[in-house]
Every structure is written in C-alpha cells, then in structure tokens.
Amino acid sequence: MAKPEPSTAGIKSALMNLPGVRQVNIIENPFADADQYGNPPYSVHVFCLGGKEDDIASCLADKVAAGITLAGSKEVQAKDATGEVKKINFDYATDKPIYARVKIRTTDEWNVDDGADYVKHEIADYINSLLMDGTVYLTKIYPTIYSIEGVGAVSY
C-alpha cells in the first residue's frame, strides 16, 4: 500500500489504516466543469465504506493538499496539523445487498451434509471480495462452484 501522503494513493492508504474502514474510493475531477457524477470542478470526492466520521474527517484534514475542494454530502469540521479548523466533505458508501440463485445438478461425489453450505460460502466469498463500484459477473462464480467435488452442472 502507498505511503500516507497527499496523492490519491496516499490518501487512500491513510484512510484504509483507520479502524473500521473497509474500502475507499476516490473520484478526482481535474477539469473546469462538473463531471458526470456532479462533482464540482477541481474537486476530490472520497467514499468510505465504514469508519468513524470524525476519524475520516481528521485524516482528510491532515492528508489532502491545500486548496483542494472536497466534495460529498457529509460535512464535518476538523482541525488540520496546524490547528486550523477546516470544513471536510466526503461520503459513506452504501452496502448493497446482492442475491444469487444457483441451480446445481450433483454427481455421486456430492457431499449431502455440507455441499450446499460450501457452495453458499464460496458465493459469499466472491461477493465480499468485490470492490466498491465494481461489477458483479455471475460467470466468474462458475469456476469456483465447478471446482467443488460432486458438482455436475451449474445454471442460474
């Protein structure tokens, strides 16, 4: 992970080191017009999944370079390293439930006691590995399910 500094990678690294922060996504708008997401010109929009509001604001106050506009619906007052109080904006990302229904035809090697739970666990692991704003590709689950002993065919 990057060294905590004013770069995008550094800010992300610093935020990821905070307790409770599970993911961070940063959208930069380096242009003179609002971007396709509605972020103001020359702004940085930080999204955090988890973490405490005050911790995130303090971290951003310390790590974001002077003169940078922070976008976001959360507005928190935080002191920077010099003790100056700054208005810090960011947003929390929202967990979105993902549901999967998979039909499996089994073979004689299928473990009737634990097989279904193992499949559920593998699907949950894939979903939990997704990054914020990532796309869910159902077909990426198939190789994992087919690798389970006793699975003959998979469909949805």
What would you call each of these model-derived segments?
Residues 2-134:
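Carbohydrate-recognition loop of C-type lectin domains
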Residues 20-21, 134-156:
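Short loop/turn elements at secondary-structure junctions
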